[in-house]
Structure formats: C-alpha cells, structure tokens
Regions:
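Sec-dependent signal peptide recognition
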Residues: 2-11
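Bacterial signal peptide processing site
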Residues: 19-21
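Extracellular structured ligand-interaction cores
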Residues: 99-101, 122-124, 171, 181-185, ...
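Short, flexible domain-boundary/linker segments around small modular repeats
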Residues: 129-175, 261-294
C-alpha cells in the first residue's frame, strides 16, 4: 500500500460540461407519490477523469442523469482516486473496467422499519458517486470446527472484512479491494473519495442506496433535525456481544480457500469481532438505526430525509435497506 505520497490524478476536460449541480430544475415538475423526493439533487453529472495510479491507469467514467421518476447511473466502476496496490498477496485481482448501469427511484419510500437484508453479488446495496459499488459483506465463511475460506466458504460464520486482523482481504486505505471479476468495491469508509469530493470535515453525500435514499460519510448533525447544531462523527448502534454464540469457533484450524489456502494448521485465535454474528444491535445505543441510517436534515435535503451513513465502526455500511428496491 502506498501511503508515503499521493500520486496526482490528471483531470481530462470533456467537450460536454461536467456538473455537480444540486439544484438542477429539469425534474422540478416531478410529483412524487413516495415519502420523499430526491429529484433535484445530483442528477446532472458527467465526468471522465484519468487515474494514473499504478494499479489503475485508466479513465474513471461516470454519469448521473434522470428520466421520469428514475435516477440513472452509468459508469465503468473505475475509482477516481488513489488506491492501494492490486494485485497484492491477500487480494490477487487486478482492477478492470466494469459495465455499470443502474436505476434508482427519485421518490424513495420506506416500506420496512426493520429493513430488508441485502447481501451478495445479485444486487448492489449502493453505488458511490464515482460508480464504484458498496459491498460491505464478504463471501468468507468458517464452520464450527474453525475451517475457514475467504472465497465462498461453506460454514455458517460470516467473516467480516474490516475491524480485525485474523483474516486479511487485502483491502486498501479506502477500505476497498477487488473482486475476481476486477470490480473494485468499498467495504467501508471511502477515504480518498471523500477527499476528492472536497469535504473531509463536512456532511458529504458519497452515493445512493439501491432504494433511492442518499448515503453520507461519517459526519452528521448532533441534532438530527437541526442544521445549526455541531457536526459530529455519527455512531452506529451495534456492539460486540458479551459472550460468543454457541459453537462459535475460537481458533482458525484450516484455511481452505482464498489467499493463503492450504494452511492446514495455523492455530490462530479468532477474536470477537471477526464474524458478523459477534455483534448485536441495541436500539438507541448510538445515533443510527439497525440499517445504519436515520431521518434528519442534510445540506442537500434541508427539509429532512432518511439517509444511510458510512461509519468508522461496525457495521461500517448498512447491510439492509428500508426502502423499496
């Protein structure tokens, strides 16, 4: 991972004007039947940026437009910021262009207070502004005996990508790595995307969830409904369980898939926090609900909206969606 210096990105000017206008009026006549409207926010973006990072060396292309009641994303999934070294010993995949095409409602509606779980490659839970996918869970699993695989394991214990040192998925400074398909994706805080968007200390809209609600990174108002209150790092409402679940493996006995596979007797302790099941949701413990979101005012939505938050602590990013997909 290169942490000593930041390699500059060269910005290629398009013949089409690039825009990040949050007050575009082309959808001002849209009458939403849902709970909220996002019609005039970030619906006129068209960017092409050359990323000369040694692990990328490609154009990052992404566009956000609207049509009727839909927000439309097209892009190539190439990050528009510095990344770590890929391939690397714990993530042997190179970044490559993807064909990203997705639609999101401009009129999101909450249909489940508990949230609907979204895990796996069939549906992206969210996309960042630069068309890079948010995919917080992993395919890594362990069985009760401690036999684990980082690549589609068969056990019932779900391995977390972040927050521990037992399993290394080769993630970089953006808490991201690369799938075998070449798709670079975020598991947590996209640090250099936030820097690119220009607001490391502000309330930064970094993407959109598949149900149409916005995604913000790290910060929010101390009083959710008061834009004059202090900006604070928002806290999730999850904590480590005081006791491990029955039959939870405590020692890694074999690594049978993924980087490092074939290590038959590693005998490495598996601390609490390595598995998704090690955490529990406690309503009101932090600022956010079970889907790592809340209702409140934001710079883009001064009247208030439900929004998800990327956090520094588990679950890092929502694992469920409250709106209709």
């Amino acid at each position: 991972m290169r942490v000593g210096s930041i390699i500059p990105l060269f910005f290629i000017l398009l013949s089409i004007s690039c825009s990040k206008n949050t007050n575009n009026n082309k959808d001002s006549e849209l009458a939403c039947e849902g709970d909220f409207s996002t019609a005039n926010v970030l619906v006129d973006i068209d960017e092409e940026i050359f990323n000369n990072d040694l692990s990328v060396n490609a154009y990052s292309r992404y566009a956000w437009t609207s049509e009727g009641s839909d927000r439309i994303l097209t892009g190539n999934g190439i990050p528009n910021h510095q990344v770590g070294i890929f391939p690397n010993p714990n993530n042997p995949n190179a970044i490559s262009e993807q064909n990203v095409s997705a639609r999101f409602t401009l009129c999101p509606t909450i249909i489940s207070e508990a949230g609907l779980e979204v895990i796996g490659p069939a549906l992206a839970i969210a996309y960042a502004i630069n068309s890079v996918k948010f995919d917080p869970a992993t395919a890594g699993r362990c069985d009760d005996s401690g036999a684990c695989s980082l690549a589609r394991g068969q056990g019932r214990w779900n391995i977390e990508a972040l927050g521990h040192n037992t399993f290394d998925f080769g993630d970089d400074m953006n808490h991201a790595h690369v799938q075998p398909s070449g798709e670079y994706h975020y598991h947590g805080m996209p640090e250099l995307l936030i820097e690119f968007l220009g607001d490391n200390k502000g309330m930064t809209l970094v993407g959109w969830a598949s149900d149409g609600f916005p995604v913000y990174a790290r910060y929010g108002y101390a009083q959710a409904d008061d834009a004059t209150s202090e900006l604070v790092a928002l806290k999730p409402s999850y904590r480590l369980k005081t006791q491990a679940d029955p039959n939870r493996p405590s020692v890694l006995t074999a690594l049978i898939g993924g980087p490092g596979q074939g290590t038959t007797s590693p005998n490495i302790p598996i601390p609490m926090g390595a598995f998704t099941q090690d955490f529990e949701y406690i309503s009101g413990l932090g600022d956010l609900d079970q889907c790592n979101g809340r209702f409140g005012v934001t710079p883009e939505f001064p009247e208030g909206i439900y929004y998800y938050v990327v956090t520094d602590d588990f679950p890092f990013f929502t694992r469920c969606l409250k709106g209709e997909i």
